[in-house]
Design a protein with these regions (language model features):
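Short alpha-helix
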Residues: 35, 159-182
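A short glycine-rich, Lys/Arg-flanked "PGG" loop and its adjoining helix->strand segment in the class I
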Residues: 123-138
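Class I SAM-dependent methyltransferase SAM/SAH-binding core
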Residues: 35-38, 42-101
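Conserved class I S-adenosyl-L-methionine
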Residues: 138-169
Length: 203
């Protein structure tokens, strides 16, 4: 397992304080958002049940993708209530409580967009993600190069792009996921987009 020192942060004050004020900003370029939406369109089946982990006011899901449920888990009620893709949401600090507040076998897909760098207990979180996913369910982790430097874990700030991807793939492997894959969907002259996926094969 990765050493705990990898997951220390400059600002170890309660995350609730940092996220208390809503941030209605796009954290990646529009071209990068478009590529992420296209990937979701290609990957997520219609009528699926989806969990948007570490969610905010925008989920990057395409408008023409019809889903039966989109649950959001995040840190700011104003942001989550402004997200018109969500059918339900909850406030939950994964760094304090890595276990997700959902029943087992609840979702076909779990998404985590440009937030993986803030998890201080990623293995525990993704073990819980695996539990709430249905058999053959997928986790989709989208990454770029931007971050809040005071809240991102130290390991993410001290390794290069290739090692960040390898690190996230190791999170999924250590959590029991299979068929772990990497996709580079970076647009030209915009923020990069690196996507890691894993599948929950129970049977």
């Amino acid at each position: 397992l990765p050493p705990k020192t990898w997951f220390t942060r400059v600002d170890e004050s309660p995350d609730e304080l940092f996220y208390s004020s809503p941030r209605f900003a796009e954290h990646i370029d529009k071209a990068t958002i478009s590529n992420l939406s296209d990937f979701y369109k290609e990957t997520i089946r219609e009528d699926s049940e989806v969990l948007d982990l570490m969610s905010s006011w925008i989920s990057h899901l395409p408008n023409d993708l019809m889903l039966s449920r989109v649950s959001g888990l995040g840190m700011n009620d104003d942001e989550l209530s402004a997200n018109d893709k969500l059918t339900d949401w909850c406030i939950h600090n994964l760094n304090n409580e890595p276990e997700l507040p959902y029943k087992a076998n609840s979702f076909n897909y779990v998404l985590c967009a440009v937030s993986i760098q803030y998890l201080t207990s990623p293995i525990e979180v993704f073990q819980s993600v695996k539990a709430v996913l249905k058999d053959q369910g997928q986790v989709i982790i989208a990454m770029s190069h931007r971050l809040f430097p005071t809240k991102a874990v130290s390991v993410f700030q001290n390794i290069n792009r290739e090692d960040r991807v390898r690190l996230v793939m190791s999170y999924l492997e250590l959590s029991g996921f299979e068929e772990i894959s990497f996709f580079d969907r970076s647009p030209k002259d915009a923020d990069p987009l690196w996507i890691v996926t894993g599948q929950n094969n129970r049977i």
